[in-house]
Amino acid sequence: MSLRTAVVPAAGLGTRFLPTTKSVPKELLPLVATPAIEIVAAEAAEAGAQRLVIVTSPGKRSVIEHFRRQPDLEDTLRERGKDAELAKILRAPDLITAEVAIQERALGLGHAVGCVEPNLDEDDDVIAVLLPDDLMLPFGVLERMAQVRAEHGGSVLCALDVPREEVSAYGVFDTEDDTAMGADVMRVRGMVEKPSPDEAPSTLVAAGRYLLDRAVFDALKRITPGAGGELQLTDAVALLVEEGHPVHLVVHRGGRHELGNPAAFLRAAVDFALSDPEHGPDLREYLQNLLDGKGSALR
């Protein structure tokens, strides 16, 4: 079966963005005027997903509200002739059907993925997992991953090729050398978490996109919890590899924005704003003036 269900883990506290995230989930912080989770949902929908399962904590249900219609607001905007604004608030509900899976305790990414199993239909044999802290641009890597799964079966992971001196910040793939699979597609032999540059088996590191065969749920039930009782998705994938399940990776050669800390988020916000036809020209001029030493409202 083709991809039908996409999963977005969104149960985290967003502590790096406090105090804002006391009341606003990090996933709803906007890049220009669009929350990151809507951008991720658009990527999933473009890859063919019809359902978005948002894994969230019991006190963080407001994320799902972004994907629900608000008839009163819609009527008000129609009455006032604000068609552009109306189109913006209809975009998320029209993208994809969203629902919630509750993660009662934050016990790792593997645990978050495991919470989704009750949401699936019997014939859901694959899910996409998209981490909302990672924006992979331009869209398209999920479609390529789906093609690889159609050809080879099993699970498919997204990888980035980084400079060797940076590998110690990531999980690094150990891969088979098989040129017959084509450029940027490799079978995974294993994974090493945050190795030193000298010990890393490659410079291919895990990115925030996974296309997982349903067998991953059984694997998650059989792995040993780590520190704090957490279940790591990488451990479940490693078990699949060990037991002979096909696991491949696709190297993403496009751009990536990490949104997990304020500095990275600001870089992404500037990038998106400069690309925005409405706001980009003015912002570019403003930034150039700052660089030229023409002053700031803050000094």
Where are the regions that the model predicts?
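Positively charged, low-complexity intrinsically disordered leader regions
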Residues: 1-6, 281-288
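Conserved beta-loop-beta/alpha segment of the NTase-like Rossmann-fold superfamily
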Residues: 63-65, 73-76, 83, 87-177, ...
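Catalytic-core segments of class I nucleotidyltransferases/pyrophosphorylases
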Residues: 128, 142, 146-150, 178-285
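Intrinsic disorder at enzyme termini
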Residues: 283-299
